[in-house]
Amino acid sequence: MFGFSFRQRKPSSAQTAKERLQILLAHERSSGGSNPDFLPLLQRDILEVVRRHMEIDSDAVDVKLERSDDLSSLEINIELPYAKQLKRA
């Protein structure tokens, strides 16, 4: 009768991507922030996750990391296919 409330849900792809991003950022912080080698790997992983749900070009994902003395900012831009169609209309 109550068996349904004890089932574990499979994490969504968004949750999995969020967890991976948190791990990457924690690793980047612990390395002193001097190693931007994770950015191409992050870009590839994001592209793979988005491609599971829609068809996008390889250059559709842009990842930028900006740093100041007390703040790091990660910007991720993904150009979605329907955005291209809207521009043409």
Curated annotation (Swiss-Prot):
Superkingdom classification of source: Bacteria
Disulfide bridge positions per record: none
Keyword RNA-binding tagged: no
Pfam family, one: MinE
Gene Ontology biological process terms, A to Z: cell division; regulation of division septum assembly
UniProt entry tagged with the keyword Cell cycle: yes
Database matches in InterPro entries: MinE (IPR005527), MinE_sf (IPR036707)
Keyword terms, alphabetized: Cell cycle, Cell division, Plasmid
Family: Belongs to the MinE family.
Function: Prevents the cell division inhibition by proteins MinC and MinD at internal division sites while permitting inhibition at polar sites. This ensures cell division at the proper site by restricting the formation of a division septum at the midpoint of the long axis of the cell.
Annotated protein name in UniProt: Cell division topological specificity factor
